[in-house]
């Protein structure tokens, strides 16, 4: 049983590397920018199309591998009722990951293409206009993604999982918050831009690793 769980967590970590790698591919570069949207930078303007293609392609195995690990976590919930709620929240929350990824990649691909084909002067207003028009997608998709993690925190803090209650404070959202604070201390650089864009994947690597290590040591 534990070997299957470890395999599932390793799938999750691999999924994070796929998804997070795509996040880095689509952002890593010079941070200089002249518009209102800080990630429409000189670096993203010069990123070749193959990097955006690869970033999108990696998202598909990434989300499948994420799903394997996230669904496996439900086996740690004690009661069937809570297990089913977690299951459906998880299924509901996985779809927006791809939608949000696609939203950013489409804008960045257009921005890069316009800068490379003689439309550089129009690239910023066009892409900022597109972002402004569809920016409502961001809170909607994030609002769909987060409930499963909030519910997991509730389950752990109330003792409804096999983990001790203190492990609620290793929740992926708290890890994300800690890493977000860390980015505020980083100098402005391509590394910071890539790290910030991949923050959720990096947080989930740590989360999966913590659970895998704890379960291995508690056997």
Predicted features and spans:
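Hydrophobic, aromatic-enriched alpha-helical segments typical of multi-pass transmembrane helices
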Residues: 1-219
